[in-house]
Amino acid sequence: MEEFKRYLELDKSKSQQHDFLYPLLFQEYIYGLAHHNQSLTRSSSLELEKTGFDNNFSLLIVKRLITQMGRQNHLSFFTNDSNQNPFLGHNTTLYSKILLDGFVVVLEIPFSIRVISSLECKEIVKSHNLRSIHSIFPFLEDKFTHLNYVLDFLIPHFIHLEILVQTLRYWVKDASSLHLLRALIHKYHNWNNIITLKKSSFSFSKRNKRFLFFLYNFHVYEYESIFTFLRNQSSHLKSNSYRPFLDRIYFYEKRDHFLEIFTNYFQAILCSFKDPFMHYVRYQGKALLASKGVFLLINKWNSYLVNFWQCYFYTWSQPGRIQINKLSNHSLDLLGYLSSVRLTSSMVRNQMLENVFLIANASKKLNTIVPIIPLIGSLSKAKFCNPLGHPISKPVWADLSDSDIIDRFGRIYRNISHYYSGSSKKMSLYRIKYIIRLSCARTLARKHKSTVRAFLKRTGSELLEEFFMEEERIFSLTFPKISSTSTSGGLYRNPIWYLDIFCINDLANHE
């Protein structure tokens, strides 16, 4: 019991640091740090976006904003979004954007301190918590072959940001910061300004992305910390240490009545969920809950998840957002792969004295397949081919030098080949290589006002091979024994998971 109290409660020395967050909003370097972080994030992406914040950000505006913050009421910043603010003399959208980005930097301070301190106290290697997203697949290879059913669901987003503000009160003791956060939220009272709904997921608007990412990650952290604990408690039926978690979730006096009712029946509910072979995996806004049990057990977890979100976070999950699949019959759309468990049979010859027996041996194996059709659709959206998969030229790159054009196409192919190196069937990557290579040739031919055949005849096909074969050469130097048995062209058969990938490939987001 004391262990979970220490997990839930902040140290007094650390909680006092949270009382002094608001004065940081009056420091110029906070906004400069927020602007610098955004510039680094955008420079690492494939496409650079120019926003109003980039075009209008300056230290002079920040100084004027800080001066007015000390003189005026918070609500004076947000009285009018379209016209000039009489106190500031500028459009309030720019000021609110700068203030939001600075506010996120301030809020990240106590959470980063808590993470670092927890790692130091537990002596946990930092790389253990910051490992590659490709580490999920070796876990699937080891665990999923022994499981039967998987619950594939999208984590529901919060209905109202006020719920998150109330949750933040547990972590941030600074009342002034919370009041300012409420003022910023009321400015975006229209939910469509914050979140754009899609068929299977949702995305944040570009103007508020950094702010909403922080709130959403905090929402997921709260959900996982409680749900994971309750899931673990299903194997310890006599434990009552789940009560502090319920006190942490039900915000103060608003839910006391329901809390009393729920805790009385909670221990009986956990009895029906006892499953020592339950595994939980989260990636982006999706999650998997896999079980070795029967369909009835995973269906109970399905019902429990819906009630868990509704009662704890006031979030509703649509029926189509949760799917129960049998691993032997269905494929999972996981991180750009189609993953499934298939039975593979082999014959073993056994001889005892003069008798010879043939024994059929069946084993399960995880198959990870590249979804070629959605990937071609992503290439088509990026203007590398048409919707049918026929390569086309890239006119916007025709003004670059030949080396820059080849380097861009080669880098895109190497990134795709690097990301999908763990595929069980790599023949589909030949199709992707063909599209990117011919698109590069057509772009070069367009630049030199020639045909593809005439251009390749004049320069030779070795001009493109040098760049597209770099990935295979790196692999052959790293794994010489495996590469000796690889297929022609360097596309090896065995899955190789690169554990240095920390973000999903842009072309793997088939949305």
From Swiss-Prot:
Keywords: Chloroplast, mRNA processing, Plastid, RNA-binding, tRNA processing. InterPro entries: Domain_X, Maturase_MatK, Maturase_MatK_N. One of its GO terms (molecular function) is RNA binding. It is found in: Plastid, Chloroplast. One of its GO terms (cellular component) is chloroplast. Disulfide bonds: none annotated. One of its GO terms (biological process) is tRNA processing. Pfam families: Intron_maturas2 (PF01348), MatK_N (PF01824). Belongs to the intron maturase 2 family. MatK subfamily. Usually encoded in the trnK tRNA gene intron. Probably assists in splicing its own and other chloroplast group II introns. It comes from the Eukaryota. PANTHER family: MATURASE K. This is Maturase K. Its main location: plastid.
